[in-house]
């Protein structure tokens, strides 16, 4: 009993409660969505009898994954994060060993397992499918990347602004980004980039390099759009970007009206759904609703706005913002740099995913397949998220004083 009491005394209970609250709200939102999809249940076409849980399966999977994830987070919080960094060769081989086959193997089935599965019929072949479940190994590799990059930064320390050391760090960052780009998952590649930038900023990267990076990125994007837009990337990716800049197609970027309507349809419906809820929403299980493609996944925020209104969105995003702040704060209070960089990496991942997903739903950023943490449907992504939660709790509970005190 004393050991349990001591554990809860040194753990970040508020952080864990915020995570649990988000998971409960996610299951509620997905249940609400399922209820509007033909009553959610699978029925017999002739008799109308209920023969399965239908779309409620997503809410059930989310609930089950959240419970398992919470247990994993609690167990992981008891493990010193430093020991996980020390065994970096193990998780690097395991995680990237799952990622690399998807570069060359596309939709190949070995019994019930499909390698290089393109979930959602896109050009993103970064998934594995086992029976009725899908898994994206780059999410697990993201955790390994944060730990190894934190170790790299910890080894470099004050030498981070030396060109030779900075070049090595950029190589460490750009190699996984390039691998993920080849897979066709540019959304995840962008998240990796933001994670790396947050961690290097926390490590003391000079502002001159930060400004130079932004200037170079801006110039590269401008040149790409001006001279190479027909050669770089896949057509639909550029169309999605142009649809945000010119949603009415006044410049004629879309080759046909059909392409234009197909590209803008999801965000257009999401924008309507988000605004239709007004202040308090149309009701979780009653009232009108607007159909939005992937409302259970990338566009779950539009669904929340539809059923719970502006107030519901503020509650959801307010709690997520609190989690981001507490994650960065946990890193800042760490007594060693390794914990500080780990917190910065996980905080950067959360911040990036939330910002990009909200931007997609508000139609200010293109659709790039980035999910909303805790809320978007997906059992494997929830489990990976709670592993990150466990790491943050580990940093919190294994530090008794601040690095900056």
Regions found by a protein language model. Give the residues of each.
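Membrane-helix boundary/helix-loop-helix interface segments in multi-pass membrane proteins
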Residues: 2-9, 13-17, 22, 28-29, ...
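Loop-to-helix entry and N-terminal half of a specific, functionally important transmembrane alpha helix
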Residues: 330-369
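Hydrophobic alpha-helical transmembrane segments
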Residues: 63-72, 141-142, 307-325
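Hydrophobic, glycine- and aromatic-enriched re-entrant/interface helices and adjoining loop segments
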Residues: 112, 118-127, 212-315, 335-339
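Transmembrane alpha-helix boundary and packing residues in multipass membrane permease domains
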Residues: 74, 147, 151, 196, ...
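Transmembrane alpha-helix boundary/anchor motif
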Residues: 71, 79, 148, 222, ...
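Hydrophobic alpha-helical segments of polytopic membrane proteins
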Residues: 71, 89-96, 163-181, 186-229, ...
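Interfacial segments of multi-pass membrane proteins
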Residues: 153, 190, 195-209, 285-312, ...
């Amino acid at each position: 009993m004393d050991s349990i009491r001591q554990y809860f005394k040194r753990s970040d209970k508020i952080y864990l409660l915020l995570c649990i609250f988000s998971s409960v709200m996610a299951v509620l939102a997905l249940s609400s969505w399922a209820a509007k999809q033909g009553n959610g249940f699978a029925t017999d076409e002739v008799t109308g009898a209920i023969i399965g849980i239908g779309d409620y399966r997503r809410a059930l999977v989310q609930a089950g994954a959240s419970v398992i994830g919470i247990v994993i987070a609690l167990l992981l919080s008891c493990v010193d994060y430093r020991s996980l960094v020390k065994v970096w060769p193990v998780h690097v081989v395991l995680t990237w060993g799952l990622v690399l086959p998807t570069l060359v193997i596309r939709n190949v089935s070995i019994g019930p397992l499909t390698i290089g599965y393109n979930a959602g019929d896109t050009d993103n072949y970064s998934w594995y499918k086992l029976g009725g479940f899908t898994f994206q190994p780059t999410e697990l590799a993201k955790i390994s990347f944060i730990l190894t990059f934190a170790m790299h930064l910890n080894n470099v320390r004050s030498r981070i602004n030396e060109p030779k050391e900075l070049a090595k760090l950029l190589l460490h960052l750009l190699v996984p980004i390039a691998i993920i780009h080849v897979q066709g998952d540019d959304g995840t590649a962008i998240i990796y980039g933001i994670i790396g930038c947050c961690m290097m900023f926390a490590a003391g990267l000079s502002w001159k390099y930060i400004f130079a990076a932004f200037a170079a990125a801006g110039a590269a994007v401008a040149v790409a759009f001006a001279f190479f837009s027909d050669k770089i990337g896949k057509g639909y990716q550029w169309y999605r970007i142009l649809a945000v800049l010119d949603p009415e197609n006044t410049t004629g970027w879309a080759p046909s009206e059909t392409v234009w309507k197909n590209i803008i349809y999801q965000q257009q419906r999401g924008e309507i759904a988000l605004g239709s809820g007004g202040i308090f929403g149309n009701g979780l299980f009653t009232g009108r609703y607007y159909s939005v493609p992937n409302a259970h996944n990338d566009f779950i925020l539009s669904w929340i706005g539809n059923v719970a209104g502006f107030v519901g969105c503020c509650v959801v995003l307010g709690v997520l913002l609190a989690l981001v702040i507490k994650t960065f704060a946990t890193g800042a209070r760490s007594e060693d740099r390794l914990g500080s960089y780990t917190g910065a990496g996980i905080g950067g991942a959360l911040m990036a995913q939330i910002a990009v997903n909200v931007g997609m739903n508000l139609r200010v950023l293109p659709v790039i397949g980035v999910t909303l943490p805790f809320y978007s449907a997906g059992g494997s992504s929830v489990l990976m998220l709670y592993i990150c939660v466990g790491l943050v709790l580990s940093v919190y509970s294994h530090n008794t004083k601040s690095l900056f005190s």
